[in-house]
Amino acid sequence: GFGEDIAMKQHQVNSLLDILFVF
């Protein structure tokens, strides 16, 4: 659903931020 899509996007963004902040 729409809420699920948002949650997925947020998870992807958080993962990318985690990767960036590691470097």
UniProtKB/Swiss-Prot annotation:
Which terms are listed as keywords in the entry? Copper, Oxygen transport, Secreted, Transport
Instruction: Name the domain of life this protein comes from.
Output: Eukaryota
List locations, semicolon-separated: Secreted, Extracellular space
Q: Which GO terms describe its molecular function?
A: oxygen carrier activity
Q: Which GO terms describe its cellular component?
A: extracellular region
Q: For this UniProt entry, what is the primary localization, expressed as one broad class?
A: secreted
Which tissues does the record link to its expression?
A: Hemolymph.
**Protein family:** Belongs to the tyrosinase family. Hemocyanin subfamily.
Chain's role: Hemocyanins are copper-containing oxygen carriers occurring freely dissolved in the hemolymph of many mollusks and arthropods.
* Name of the protein in question: Hemocyanin subunit 4
- Origin organism of this chain? Carcinus maenas
Q: Lineage of the source organism? A: Eukaryota, Metazoa, Ecdysozoa, Arthropoda, Crustacea
